[in-house]
Amino acid sequence: MATQRKHLVKDFNPYITCYICKGYLIKPTTVTECLHTFCKTCIVQHFEDSNDCPRCGNQVHETNPLEMLRLDNTLEEIIFKLVPGLREQELERESEFWKKNKPQENGQDDTSKADKPKVDEEGDENEDDKDYHRSDPQIAICLDCLRNNGQSGDNVVKGLMKKFIRCSTRVTVGTIKKFLSLKLKLPSSYELDVLCNGEIMGKDHTMEFIYMTRWRLRGENFRCLNCSASQVCSQDGPLYQSYPMVLQYRPRIDFG
Protein backbone atom coordinates (compact mmCIF):
# COMPACT_ATOMS: atom_id res chain seq x y z
CA MET A 1 0.00 0.00 0.00
CA ALA A 2 1.47 3.33 -1.11
CA THR A 3 2.17 5.84 1.67
CA GLN A 4 0.59 9.27 1.37
CA ARG A 5 3.11 11.99 0.52
CA LYS A 6 3.45 14.72 3.14
CA HIS A 7 3.11 18.18 1.61
CA LEU A 8 5.50 20.96 2.58
CA VAL A 9 4.70 24.67 2.75
CA LYS A 10 6.93 25.29 -0.28
CA ASP A 11 4.63 23.07 -2.35
CA PHE A 12 1.92 25.74 -1.98
CA ASN A 13 4.17 28.75 -2.64
CA PRO A 14 2.82 29.38 -6.18
CA TYR A 15 -0.63 29.91 -4.65
CA ILE A 16 0.26 31.91 -1.52
CA THR A 17 3.01 34.27 -2.72
CA CYS A 18 2.67 37.68 -4.34
CA TYR A 19 3.68 38.03 -7.99
CA ILE A 20 4.92 41.59 -7.35
CA CYS A 21 7.01 41.37 -4.16
CA LYS A 22 7.63 37.56 -4.22
CA GLY A 23 6.79 37.35 -0.49
CA TYR A 24 3.84 35.66 1.20
CA LEU A 25 0.52 37.36 0.45
CA ILE A 26 -0.25 39.98 3.11
CA LYS A 27 -3.91 41.04 3.14
CA PRO A 28 -4.45 39.12 -0.14
CA THR A 29 -6.46 41.24 -2.55
CA THR A 30 -7.99 39.86 -5.75
CA VAL A 31 -8.55 41.72 -9.02
CA THR A 32 -12.15 40.85 -9.90
CA GLU A 33 -11.59 41.19 -13.65
CA CYS A 34 -8.94 38.46 -13.95
CA LEU A 35 -8.99 36.86 -10.44
CA HIS A 36 -5.25 37.33 -9.88
CA THR A 37 -4.31 37.95 -6.24
CA PHE A 38 -1.59 40.18 -4.77
CA CYS A 39 -0.63 41.81 -1.47
CA LYS A 40 -2.99 44.74 -0.90
CA THR A 41 -0.16 47.24 -0.53
CA CYS A 42 1.60 45.92 -3.64
CA ILE A 43 -1.42 46.11 -5.94
CA VAL A 44 -2.52 49.52 -4.64
CA GLN A 45 0.96 50.92 -5.34
CA HIS A 46 0.96 49.31 -8.79
CA PHE A 47 -2.38 50.89 -9.71
CA GLU A 48 -1.05 54.34 -8.89
CA ASP A 49 1.02 54.10 -12.10
CA SER A 50 -0.92 51.62 -14.24
CA ASN A 51 -4.47 50.39 -14.91
CA ASP A 52 -3.32 46.94 -16.06
CA CYS A 53 -2.99 43.72 -14.06
CA PRO A 54 0.75 43.20 -13.36
CA ARG A 55 0.43 39.47 -13.99
CA CYS A 56 -1.68 39.09 -17.15
CA GLY A 57 -1.46 42.63 -18.53
CA ASN A 58 -5.23 42.99 -19.02
CA GLN A 59 -6.75 46.40 -18.38
CA VAL A 60 -8.60 46.27 -15.07
CA HIS A 61 -10.49 49.58 -15.34
CA GLU A 62 -10.16 52.59 -17.62
CA THR A 63 -10.01 55.20 -14.87
CA ASN A 64 -10.23 53.67 -11.37
CA PRO A 65 -8.84 50.11 -11.09
CA LEU A 66 -8.98 50.30 -7.27
CA GLU A 67 -12.74 49.78 -7.50
CA MET A 68 -12.10 46.30 -8.90
CA LEU A 69 -10.19 45.05 -5.83
CA ARG A 70 -11.64 42.69 -3.22
CA LEU A 71 -9.98 41.42 -0.04
CA ASP A 72 -9.79 37.62 0.22
CA ASN A 73 -10.17 36.92 3.95
CA THR A 74 -10.48 33.17 3.40
CA LEU A 75 -7.12 32.97 1.63
CA GLU A 76 -5.58 35.14 4.36
CA GLU A 77 -6.66 32.64 7.03
CA ILE A 78 -5.31 29.73 4.97
CA ILE A 79 -1.91 31.43 4.59
CA PHE A 80 -1.72 32.24 8.31
CA LYS A 81 -2.40 28.58 9.11
CA LEU A 82 0.16 27.33 6.58
CA VAL A 83 3.03 29.68 7.49
CA PRO A 84 4.10 29.50 11.18
CA GLY A 85 4.49 32.88 12.88
CA LEU A 86 3.29 34.99 9.94
CA ARG A 87 0.12 36.20 11.67
CA GLU A 88 2.04 37.25 14.79
CA GLN A 89 4.67 39.03 12.68
CA GLU A 90 2.05 41.08 10.82
CA LEU A 91 0.08 41.98 13.96
CA GLU A 92 3.28 43.16 15.64
CA ARG A 93 4.27 45.20 12.58
CA GLU A 94 0.87 46.90 12.42
CA SER A 95 0.86 47.58 16.14
CA GLU A 96 4.34 49.12 16.03
CA PHE A 97 3.40 51.36 13.10
CA TRP A 98 0.23 52.69 14.71
CA LYS A 99 2.00 53.24 18.03
CA LYS A 100 4.45 55.53 16.24
CA ASN A 101 1.97 57.24 13.91
CA LYS A 102 -1.39 57.32 15.68
CA PRO A 103 -3.24 60.65 15.34
CA GLN A 104 -3.08 63.01 18.33
CA GLU A 105 -5.94 65.40 17.44
CA ASN A 106 -8.65 63.45 19.27
CA GLY A 107 -7.25 64.52 22.65
CA GLN A 108 -6.61 61.03 23.97
CA ASP A 109 -3.52 60.33 26.01
CA ASP A 110 -0.84 58.24 24.30
CA THR A 111 -0.70 55.96 27.32
CA SER A 112 -4.43 55.31 27.50
CA LYS A 113 -5.44 51.72 28.04
CA ALA A 114 -7.25 51.50 24.72
CA ASP A 115 -4.08 52.32 22.80
CA LYS A 116 -1.78 49.82 24.52
CA PRO A 117 -1.03 46.76 22.38
CA LYS A 118 -2.24 43.58 24.05
CA VAL A 119 -0.23 40.38 23.87
CA ASP A 120 -2.32 37.23 23.46
CA GLU A 121 0.15 34.43 24.05
CA GLU A 122 -2.42 31.65 24.23
CA GLY A 123 -4.55 32.86 21.32
CA ASP A 124 -7.61 32.80 23.59
CA GLU A 125 -10.70 33.62 21.53
CA ASN A 126 -12.58 34.76 24.63
CA GLU A 127 -10.03 37.51 25.25
CA ASP A 128 -10.41 38.69 21.65
CA ASP A 129 -14.19 38.84 22.09
CA LYS A 130 -13.84 41.00 25.22
CA ASP A 131 -11.34 43.27 23.51
CA TYR A 132 -13.82 44.64 20.95
CA HIS A 133 -10.93 45.36 18.56
CA ARG A 134 -9.36 47.90 20.95
CA SER A 135 -5.95 46.32 20.42
CA ASP A 136 -6.31 46.66 16.64
CA PRO A 137 -4.51 49.54 14.92
CA GLN A 138 -6.68 52.61 15.60
CA ILE A 139 -7.61 55.54 13.37
CA ALA A 140 -9.21 58.94 14.11
CA ILE A 141 -12.18 59.87 11.92
CA CYS A 142 -14.27 63.02 11.52
CA LEU A 143 -17.89 62.29 10.48
CA ASP A 144 -19.22 65.39 8.73
CA CYS A 145 -22.82 65.87 7.58
CA LEU A 146 -22.97 66.82 3.89
CA ARG A 147 -25.91 69.09 3.22
CA ASN A 148 -27.32 69.65 -0.27
CA ASN A 149 -29.84 72.47 -0.56
CA GLY A 150 -33.30 71.15 -1.30
CA GLN A 151 -32.34 67.49 -1.11
CA SER A 152 -34.98 65.17 0.30
CA GLY A 153 -34.00 63.96 3.76
CA ASP A 154 -31.96 67.00 4.78
CA ASN A 155 -34.36 67.60 7.67
CA VAL A 156 -33.86 64.05 8.92
CA VAL A 157 -30.08 63.74 8.65
CA LYS A 158 -28.39 66.11 11.08
CA GLY A 159 -24.82 66.74 12.12
CA LEU A 160 -23.45 64.79 15.09
CA MET A 161 -22.87 66.62 18.37
CA LYS A 162 -19.57 64.75 18.66
CA LYS A 163 -18.32 64.11 15.16
CA PHE A 164 -14.81 62.86 16.02
CA ILE A 165 -14.47 59.13 16.72
CA ARG A 166 -11.64 56.66 17.13
CA CYS A 167 -12.05 53.11 15.85
CA SER A 168 -10.25 50.07 14.47
CA THR A 169 -8.78 50.35 10.97
CA ARG A 170 -10.73 47.17 10.16
CA VAL A 171 -14.11 48.86 10.65
CA THR A 172 -16.13 48.89 7.43
CA VAL A 173 -18.30 51.60 5.91
CA GLY A 174 -21.30 49.39 6.65
CA THR A 175 -20.49 49.59 10.37
CA ILE A 176 -20.08 53.37 10.15
CA LYS A 177 -23.55 53.58 8.57
CA LYS A 178 -25.04 51.54 11.43
CA PHE A 179 -23.30 53.82 13.94
CA LEU A 180 -24.71 56.92 12.23
CA SER A 181 -28.22 55.45 12.06
CA LEU A 182 -28.07 54.71 15.78
CA LYS A 183 -26.74 58.13 16.78
CA LEU A 184 -29.15 60.01 14.48
CA LYS A 185 -32.08 57.74 15.45
CA LEU A 186 -32.93 57.04 11.83
CA PRO A 187 -35.63 54.54 10.76
CA SER A 188 -34.29 51.08 9.93
CA SER A 189 -35.32 51.55 6.29
CA TYR A 190 -33.44 54.85 5.95
CA GLU A 191 -30.24 54.63 3.90
CA LEU A 192 -27.16 56.82 3.91
CA ASP A 193 -24.27 57.46 1.55
CA VAL A 194 -20.77 57.73 3.05
CA LEU A 195 -18.23 59.66 1.00
CA CYS A 196 -14.50 60.40 1.06
CA ASN A 197 -13.18 63.24 -1.07
CA GLY A 198 -16.57 63.41 -2.82
CA GLU A 199 -16.58 59.72 -3.81
CA ILE A 200 -19.20 57.29 -2.49
CA MET A 201 -17.58 54.46 -0.53
CA GLY A 202 -18.71 50.83 -0.76
CA LYS A 203 -20.15 49.21 2.37
CA ASP A 204 -17.33 46.62 2.50
CA HIS A 205 -14.49 49.18 2.32
CA THR A 206 -12.45 49.23 5.53
CA MET A 207 -11.13 52.43 7.10
CA GLU A 208 -7.58 51.30 6.33
CA PHE A 209 -8.44 50.75 2.65
CA ILE A 210 -10.06 54.19 2.37
CA TYR A 211 -7.15 55.80 4.23
CA MET A 212 -4.59 54.31 1.84
CA THR A 213 -6.47 54.65 -1.45
CA ARG A 214 -8.55 57.83 -1.03
CA TRP A 215 -7.65 60.06 1.90
CA ARG A 216 -3.85 59.98 1.71
CA LEU A 217 -3.95 61.11 -1.92
CA ARG A 218 -4.84 64.63 -0.77
CA GLY A 219 -1.12 65.22 -0.40
CA GLU A 220 -0.16 67.02 2.84
CA ASN A 221 1.90 66.07 5.91
CA PHE A 222 2.69 62.49 4.92
CA ARG A 223 4.48 59.91 7.04
CA CYS A 224 6.09 56.76 5.74
CA LEU A 225 4.87 53.30 6.71
CA ASN A 226 7.63 50.72 7.15
CA CYS A 227 7.19 47.88 4.70
CA SER A 228 6.93 44.33 5.96
CA ALA A 229 9.80 41.90 5.61
CA SER A 230 8.16 40.32 2.57
CA GLN A 231 8.10 43.61 0.64
CA VAL A 232 10.65 45.95 -0.84
CA CYS A 233 10.68 49.36 0.84
CA SER A 234 10.96 52.39 -1.43
CA GLN A 235 10.36 56.14 -1.28
CA ASP A 236 7.11 55.55 -3.13
CA GLY A 237 5.87 53.15 -0.43
CA PRO A 238 2.52 53.42 1.37
CA LEU A 239 1.94 56.71 3.14
CA TYR A 240 -0.28 57.86 5.99
CA GLN A 241 -1.36 61.28 7.22
CA SER A 242 -1.14 62.38 10.82
CA TYR A 243 -4.54 64.10 11.17
CA PRO A 244 -8.08 62.62 11.29
CA MET A 245 -9.61 61.27 8.10
CA VAL A 246 -12.81 63.09 7.10
CA LEU A 247 -15.81 61.04 5.98
CA GLN A 248 -19.00 62.76 4.89
CA TYR A 249 -22.51 61.34 5.07
CA ARG A 250 -25.81 62.31 3.46
CA PRO A 251 -29.21 60.78 2.59
CA ARG A 252 -28.89 58.06 -0.06
CA ILE A 253 -29.31 59.50 -3.56
CA ASP A 254 -31.18 57.22 -5.97
CA PHE A 255 -29.78 57.78 -9.45
CA GLY A 256 -32.54 55.63 -10.92
From Swiss-Prot:
Pfam families: RAWUL, zf-C3HC4_2. Gene3D superfamilies: Phosphatidylinositol 3-kinase Catalytic Subunit, Chain A, domain 1, Zinc/RING finger domain, C3HC4 (zinc finger). It is found in: Nucleus; Nucleus, Nucleoplasm. Signal peptide: none annotated. Keywords: Metal-binding, Nucleus, Repressor, Transcription, Transcription regulation, Zinc, Zinc-finger. Residues 94-133 are annotated as: Disordered. A zinc finger (RING-type) spans 18-57. One of its GO terms (cellular component) is nucleoplasm. GO terms for molecular function: histone H2AK119 ubiquitin ligase activity; zinc ion binding. InterPro entries: PcG_RING_finger, RAWUL, Znf_RING, Znf_RING/FYVE/PHD, Znf_RING_CS. Coiled coil: none annotated. PANTHER family: POLYCOMB GROUP RING FINGER PROTEIN. Component of a PRC1-like complex that contains PCGF5, RNF2 and UBE2D3. Interacts with RNF2; the interaction is direct. Interacts with CBX6, CBX7 and CBX8. Interacts with AUTS2; the interaction is direct. Identified in a complex that contains AUTS2, PCGF5, CSNK2B and RNF2. Component of a Polycomb group (PcG) multiprotein PRC1-like complex, a complex class required to maintain the transcriptionally repressive state of many genes, including Hox genes, throughout development. PcG PRC1 complex acts via chromatin remodeling and modification of histones; it mediates monoubiquitination of histone H2A 'Lys-119', rendering chromatin heritably changed in its expressibility. Within the PRC1-like complex, regulates RNF2 ubiquitin ligase activity. This is Polycomb group RING finger protein 5. The lineage of its organism: Eukaryota, Metazoa, Chordata, Craniata, Vertebrata.
